[in-house]
C-alpha cells in the first residue's frame, strides 16, 4: 500500500490584528489565509502527483514535481515557524533571556550586534526570501542565514529558531517598498519565549519545529 500524508494550515496563536501597529490585520489575514494556504495546497498537490506515480497510475516530470514540493513545503514549514515566532506588543519584543541570550552573546558578542547582523541579512536578501537564525548541530553553534525564495541557500542540518519573512506579501500593503522599516519594526513583536523553546528542543536532539 502506498500512501502519503497531507499538510494542513495551522491556526494563528493570536488574532489577525494582534500585531498592530507593527503588522496590520489586513496583511496578517491575507498572508495566513491566502499565501500560507497556497503553500499548503501546493505541497499537497505535489504529494498527490508523487503518490499516483508510485502507484503506477500516472507519469510525472520528477524534477518539476520535486522542485514544486521543495518550494511549497519549505514555504509551509517556514511560515509555521514565523507565526509563533511573533507575539503581540507587550508580550513580544525586547531582549531575550535564558539559553538563547547566552548563545547569542557567545557567538555574536552581544544582542545588539546580533540584531544588527540579522537585520542586515533580512534587508539584503536578494529578491524575495527569509532571514533565519539557526542552531547548527554539526559544530553546535548559532548562525544567521539567508534563504532565497523558500528553499535556496539553507544549511541542510540546521534547526530554524527564528524566521523573518521578507517576501513582499509580508509587508508591502503597509510599508510599500520600505523593507527596512518593516524589519526594524518587526523586532517589537519577536516572541523570545518561542525561540527559547525551539533552542531547548534542538539542544536535546529533538526537532525544533515540533513544540
Curated annotation (Swiss-Prot):
Binds 1 Fe cation per subunit. PROSITE patterns: SOD_MN (PS00088). This is Superoxide dismutase [Fe]. It is an enzyme of class 1 (oxidoreductase). Fe cation binds at residues 31, 79, 165, 169. One of its GO terms (molecular function) is superoxide dismutase activity. Keywords: Iron, Metal-binding, Oxidoreductase. It comes from Pyrobaculum aerophilum (strain ATCC 51768 / DSM 7523 / JCM 9630 / CIP 104966 / NBRC 100827 / IM2). It comes from the Archaea. The gene is sod. The keyword Iron applies. PANTHER family: SUPEROXIDE DISMUTASE 2, SUPEROXIDE DISMUTASE [MN], MITOCHONDRIAL. Its EC number is 1.15.1.1. It catalyses: 2 superoxide + 2 H(+) = H2O2 + O2. Belongs to the iron/manganese superoxide dismutase family. Homotetramer. Its cofactor is Fe cation. Destroys superoxide anion radicals which are normally produced within the cells and which are toxic to biological systems.
Amino acid at each position: 500500500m502506498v500512501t502519503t500524508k497531507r499538510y494542513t494550515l495551522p491556526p494563528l496563536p493570536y488574532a489577525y490584528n494582534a500585531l498592530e501597529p507593527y503588522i496590520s490585520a489586513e496583511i496578517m489575514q491575507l498572508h495566513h489565509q491566502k499565501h500560507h494556504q497556497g503553500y499548503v495546497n501546493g505541497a499537497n498537490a505535489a504529494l498527490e502527483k508523487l503518490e499516483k506515480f508510485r502507484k503506477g497510475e500516472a507519469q510525472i516530470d520528477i524534477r518539476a514535481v520535486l522542485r514544486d514540493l521543495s518550494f511549497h513545503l519549505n514555504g509551509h514549514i517556514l511560515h509555521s515557524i514565523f507565526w509563533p515566532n511573533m507575539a503581540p506588543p507587550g508580550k513580544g519584543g525586547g531582549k531575550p533571556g535564558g539559553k538563547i541570550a547566552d548563545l547569542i552573546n557567545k557567538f555574536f558578542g552581544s544582542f545588539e550586534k546580533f540584531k544588527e547582523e540579522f537585520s542586515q541579512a533580512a534587508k539584503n536578501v536578494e529578491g524575495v526570501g527569509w532571514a533565519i537564525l539557526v542552531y547548527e548541530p554539526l559544530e553546535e553553534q548559532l548562525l544567521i542565514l539567508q534563504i532565497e525564495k523558500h528553499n535556496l541557500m539553507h544549511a541542510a542540518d540546521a534547526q530554524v529558531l527564528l524566521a523573518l519573512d521578507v517576501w513582499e506579501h509580508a509587508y508591502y500593503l503597509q510599508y510599500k517598498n520600505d523593507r527596512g522599516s518593516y524589519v526594524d519594526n518587526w523586532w517589537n513583536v519577536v516572541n523570545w519565549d518561542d525561540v527559547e523553546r525551539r533552542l531547548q528542543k534542538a539542544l536535546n536532539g529533538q526537532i525544533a519545529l515540533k513544540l
